[in-house]
């Protein structure tokens, strides 16, 4: 799902079986992240391909009409992944630029999760860097928005994670004491801070999914 700054996308499709050969070991789990862009997913086939976890888009916002939108496949994907025994988390693609908007979005997420158990918590995905100057917020303000998001969701029983590309994790975000989901499309990342998950390709090929899907490795 990443517009991962200037990191190059994987040039050609990467079969999940190849990814397993490269990255699967006793200390890792291999997974995917999905949204309505993937359409209907055959979760049984996904499980049989060797996928161990899925992070599912719960929604996004705001739209130009200032709406918060539930991903139309969110419930179906969450149920499907859980039915196959995959570990699950969700992510929210946010365009928020005030604490008030963060509060509204955290409530939207909590309301739609409605107590649903998550293994991998809720990820905060802010990538609207092209319009950053229009928002008149500082890097400190952005970090404060994440911290508020995290504290609000923890009150609802959910751990949180920060998603970002290598460039922005190094140059914008304060990653100290945060669970980090790194996006860096390369064979071997040289990102040298702590991270929990690495999204290494946006061109994954997985049985049960039409078209490309993001591939991720989780470190136990």
Which sequence ranges carry the predicted segments?
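Gram-positive cell-envelope targeting signals
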Residues: 1-6
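Hydrophobic anchor at the start of a short beta-strand
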Residues: 88, 159-160, 180
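Short beta-strand/turn micro-motifs composed of small residues
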Residues: 92, 164, 184
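Aromatic-lined carbohydrate-recognition surfaces of secreted/lumenal glycan-active proteins
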Residues: 157-170
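Functionally critical loop-and-helix segments that line ligand-binding/catalytic clefts
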Residues: 7-38, 175-220
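Substrate-binding cleft of extracellular glycoside hydrolase catalytic domains
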Residues: 24-144, 148, 154-156
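Short, electropositive alpha-helical surface patch
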Residues: 106-114, 173-182
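Short catalytic/ligand-binding loop motif for oxyanion handling, primarily in non-cytosolic enzymes
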Residues: 131-132, 169-172
């Amino acid at each position: 799902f990443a517009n991962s700054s200037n990191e190059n996308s994987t040039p050609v499709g990467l079969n999940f079986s190849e990814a397993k050969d490269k990255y699967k070991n006793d200390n890792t789990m291999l997974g995917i992240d999905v949204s309505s862009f993937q359409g209907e997913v055959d979760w049984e086939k996904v499980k049989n391909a060797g996928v161990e976890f899925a992070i599912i888009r719960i929604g996004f916002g705001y739209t130009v009409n200032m709406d918060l939108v539930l991903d139309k496949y969110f419930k179906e994907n969450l149920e499907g992944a859980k039915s196959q025994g995959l570990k699950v988390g969700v992510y929210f693609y946010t365009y928020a630029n005030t604490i008030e908007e963060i509060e509204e979005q955290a409530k939207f997420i909590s309301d739609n999760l409605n107590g649903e158990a998550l293994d991998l918590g809720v990820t905060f995905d802010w990538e609207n860097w092209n319009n950053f100057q229009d928002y008149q917020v500082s890097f400190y303000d952005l970090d404060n928005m994440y911290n508020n998001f995290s504290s609000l969701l923890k009150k609802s029983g959910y751990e949180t994670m920060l998603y970002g590309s290598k460039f922005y994790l190094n140059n914008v975000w304060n990653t100290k004491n945060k669970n980090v989901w790194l996006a860096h499309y390369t064979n071997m990342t040289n990102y040298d801070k702590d991270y929990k998950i690495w999204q290494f390709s946006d061109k994954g090929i997985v049985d049960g999914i039409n078209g490309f899907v993001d591939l991720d490795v989780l470190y136990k």
